[in-house]
Amino acid sequence: MLERFVGQTSFVSQEDFKKNFKVNVPENFNFGYDVVDAWAEEEPEKKALCWTNDKGEHIDFTFAEMKKYTDQTAAYFQSLGIGRGDMVMLILKRRYEFWFSIIALHKLGAVVIPATHLLTKKDIVYRANAADIKMIVCAGEEVITKHIEDALPESPTIEHVVSVGPFVPSGFHDFHKEWENVPAFVRPVHANSNDDISLLYFTSGTTGNPKMVAHDFTYPLGHITTGCYWHNLHRDSLHLTIADTGWGKAVWGKLYGQWI
């Protein structure tokens, strides 16, 4: 996979790297199609994600399964009216549905806004109005869903809230129940251009209100250096990054460069 995007992959010195390392950026690059689906076609049984929790549950997902589930998630989000340019906040802690959701939203050309589960009502209201958030997908924990419920009356752009369970409040969509009954995913004719926004983070707001920091669809390619030359990962490496999915390190530490 790496060779698709980098002409020279090994180097004999720092000078060699500085002189010859170059990322080849495809037109209309989309991490969902050009990396996840490409792996699913080339090596469908290759392990993509090893997920576990503090209850001892353990699931290994192959790239074939990631394609299947991200397509299914994309179709589900399409059924809720999500498409290119729509703002979607993810408050999913370390749930595997985060990987389904972020890749599905990339496939739709939507804008992903990862957020920490520490957000309270005022934090959600501020972010929803600043970014015109259309949908929130959250972990089904009462402390999270309560803050979202309290924020909704002051967040007029939010049309849907989806819970991945186990708790699904009244008025929230049930991800796993509704997800099972969607039609086959139809890939958008033109999901994105390279300079479209794909990922948006809010800063911590240490000297005022949080600021929005946008990344375009080519952003994952920038983390080839992270996965290959900083983390020193190889083809079948197993890598652990301890980061809540609301933080930036979740995507640059356990998704983009690592899967390329």
Residue ranges and their predicted role:
Residues M1-F61, E65-Q78, E154-T157, F167-S170, ...:
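N-lobe entry segment of adenylate-forming
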Residues P44-K47, S163-S170, E180-F202, N209, ...:
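Conserved pre-ATP/AMP-binding loop-to-beta segment of ANL
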Residues E45, L49-I103, T120-V125, F175-K177, ...:
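Conserved AMP-binding/adenylate-forming core of the ANL superfamily
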Residues I59-A64, H190, S198-G222:
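Conserved AMP-binding A3 loop
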Residues V88, L105, I136, I197, ...:
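Conserved S/T- and glycine-rich ATP-binding loop of Class I adenylate-forming
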Residues L92-R95, P114-L118, A243-G248:
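Conserved AMP-binding
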Residues F100-I103, K107-K177:
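Structural core segment of the AMP-binding/adenylate-forming
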Residues L221-I260:
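Conserved AMP-binding/adenylation subdomain of ANL enzymes
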